[in-house]
A protein has these predicted regions:
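Short glycine/proline- and aromatic-enriched beta-strand/turn motifs that initiate or cap beta-hairpins
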Residues: 23-83
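Transmembrane beta-strands of outer-membrane beta-barrel pores
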Residues: 46-50, 70-72, 79-83, 100-102, ...
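Cleavable N-terminal export/targeting peptides
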Residues: 1-39
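Residues that define the transmembrane beta-barrel architecture of outer-membrane proteins
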Residues: 36-40, 58-62, 88-92, 101, ...
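Short loop/turn motifs that connect adjacent beta-strands in outer-membrane beta-barrel proteins
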Residues: 24-39, 106, 177-185, 213-226
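Outer-membrane beta-barrel "beta-signal"
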Residues: 24-26, 210, 237-249
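Membrane-embedded beta-strand positions of outer-membrane beta-barrel proteins
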Residues: 42-44, 66, 75-77, 96, ...
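Detector for outer-membrane/organellar transmembrane beta-barrel domains
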Residues: 124-195
Length: 249
């Protein structure tokens, strides 16, 4: 009988150990290098007004972000939906980008709920019946200043004075600095030539802005960045005051 009991114990022990082994956390050093180097971004901004490159695109809005990055490469999804006004712009953008040193390049697929497709279908890519706008950008960070250039190359782009595709472009210079416990960013943006996409008849400064951000610490491990921004569009002679906050784990 004693020999039989020993045999039963020997048979049961491996099965008793299995749940315990299943609960063990994976050793980070044993993970493949690819998995360890991938970074994930999950965040959401809530803003009092949606101002983009000097254009008023809506009132109070929720703007979520989901992205992954790996060794300079990144793929990000970004969206915007109005909270106070259902008719505000709905937007869903996908951006693939690469940064090496101080140089960055990228391509963005913008989708708006207004365009050439009256049914506002996302998977509608026909040249003359889509709400998508495809944009390429290149930029360089000089340290004190960062310069970016953006050009639409396909989709629902604007037209120039002659009614032809404008290849609408926008360039922006930004200068980050720190002052009085806040992180500040000053920016000046301009449209270099005529396009209906930005509602310009030629070269025009469309964005002059100053933004301040400060973290409000909630716990030792969690803080909420609060930001305020003054933005003006000399072309349209309009000015905006925006406040918002970011939620990010």
């Amino acid at each position: 009988m004693e020999k039989i009991n020993r045999r039963i114990v020997l048979l049961v022990l491996p099965f008793m150990a299995m749940p315990i082994m299943g609960q063990e956390k994976p050793d980070e050093e044993a993970l493949p290098t690819l998995v360890k180097d991938v970074e994930t971004t999950i965040a959401a901004d809530v803003v009092s007004q949606y101002i983009w490159r000097g254009q008023d695109l809506g009132n109070v809005s929720l703007q979520p972000t989901l992205g992954v990055g790996y060794k300079g490469f990144s793929l990000n999804a970004w969206g915007s939906v109005g909270l106070s006004e259902p008719k505000d712009t709905k937007e869903f953008d996908l951006t693939v980008a690469y940064t090496i040193g101080r140089l960055n390049v990228g391509v963005t697929d913008y989708w708006f709920d207004a365009g050439l497709d009256p049914d506002n279908r996302y998977f509608k890519y026909g040249a003359h019946e889509t709400n998508h706008v495809f944009e390429a950008n290149i930029g360089y960070d000089f340290g004190l200043l960062s310069v970016q250039w953006f050009t639409n190359f396909a989709g629902n782009d604007g037209v120039n004075k002659h009614g032809h595709r404008a290849y609408s472009s926008y360039m922006e210079v930004t200068a980050p600095f720190r002052l009085a416990t806040c992180d500040w960013t000053a920016a000046v943006g301009a449209v270099p030539y005529a396009t209906s996409f930005y509602n310009t008849n030629g070269f025009a400064v469309t964005n002059v802005s100053l933004k301040a951000t400060k973290e409000i610490r909630v716990t030792d491990t969690f803080a909420i960045p609060i930001f305020g921004q003054i933005a003006a569009n000399p072309r349209s002679q309009k000015a905006y005051l925006v406040v918002g906050f970011t939620l990010q784990p």
